[in-house]
A protein has these predicted regions:
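Ligand-binding cleft/hinge of the Venus flytrap
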Residues: 26-34, 111-112, 124, 130-151
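Short helix-loop capping/hinge motifs at secondary-structure junctions, enriched
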Residues: 102-109, 143, 202-207
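Periplasmic-binding protein-like
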Residues: 82-95, 185-214, 235-240
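Flexible hinge/capping segments at coil-to-helix
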Residues: 91, 100-121
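N-terminal hydrophobic or amphipathic helices and topogenic motifs
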Residues: 1-57, 75-86, 106-111, 139, ...
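Short loop->beta-strand "edge-of-pocket" segments that line small-molecule binding or catalytic clefts
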Residues: 10-20, 112-131
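A ligand-binding cleft/hinge motif common to bilobed small-molecule-binding domains
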Residues: 63-77, 162-191
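Short helices/loops that flank or line small-molecule/ion binding pockets
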Residues: 46-60, 65, 154-169
Length: 255
């Protein structure tokens, strides 16, 4: 008898590649406590979805803004997501915006303030979903990134951006509200996002994936997400096709 099929055998390790986020960290903790082993690798959204497409992971954590930036953001994942073979597990809504020092001493209120000569910015790394969202917003408002002091100074997590500002090395950054609160920074909300786990549809009925879904749908997980500043668990646990998730499913592009 195969070890994995024996009665009482430990659940198979779930390989999760995910963009950094606080709901993901909460999921990891609760999954581990429930006895489900998770091999988590934090990487940017595009790398996470690409790894799922190549069969290198079982779940891919990525985020897409709601509203006017949804379509161009979703389109970027079209190279790897397939409407027939992939499904999305809704993890959480979250709010992205500007981190500034307590009391906002420089009077930063919008993206246009990032171009001011007296403002030092710290960015996320190239390829991160958060940086992609910021660049879409800058383009809409016709703000040239080259005019932003510190645009090429990068950190790899929301917390690292917040810590950089809290330590006095920058005046403003862009990320999720939870990180700003944890480092006692003020926060200026600019965008709402949905965070998803992408999964192969055929794996949804496997025991390990059923346990993933059970954790995400549990009251304890939803309650924990609600406690995170800027997070909302309203649709947490919903399983969606790409066309259900987006007004138009991302077109799978030719390789």
């Amino acid at each position: 008898t195969e070890l994995g099929k024996t009665v009482g055998a430990a659940p198979a390790m779930i390989r999760l590649d995910a963009s950094h986020g606080f709901a993901v960290a909460t999921f990891l903790r609760q999954a581990t406590e429930s006895g489900l082993p998770i091999d988590l690798r934090y990487r940017n959204s595009t790398d996470a979805v690409a790894a799922l497409s190549r069969g290198e992971s079982d779940l891919a954590g990525f985020h897409v803004p709601t509203g006017e930036f949804e379509a161009p953001s979703a389109e970027r994942f079209g190279k790897w997501l397939d409407a027939r073979s992939h499904r999305l597990i809704h993890l959480a809504y979250r709010t992205q915006g500007l981190f500034v020092n307590p009391g906002n001493p420089l009077g930063i209120h919008s993206l246009s303030d990032l171009s001011r000569a007296d403002v030092r910015f710290v960015n996320r790394q190239v390829g991160s979903g958060t940086r992609m969202l910021l660049e879409l917003m800058l383009s809409q408002f016709e703000i040239n990134p080259a005019t932003i002091n510190g645009f090429e100074n990068t950190e790899f997590t929301h917390s690292a951006v917040a810590a950089f500002i809290a330590s006095g090395m920058a005046d403003v950054g862009f990320g999720v509200q939870t990180a700003a609160e944890r480092f006692k920074l003020d926060f200026i909300p600019l965008a709402r996002e949905r965070y998803f786990f992408a999964v192969n549809a055929e794996s949804l009925d496997q025991p390990g994936m059923r346990q993933v879904i059970d954790v995400v749908r549990s009251n304890s997980f939803r309650d924990a997400v609600h406690q995170l500043a800027g997070y909302d668990a309203t649709d947490t646990g919903e399983i969606l096709t790409l066309s259900q998730a987006f007004n138009a499913a991302p077109r799978k592009q030719a390789a």
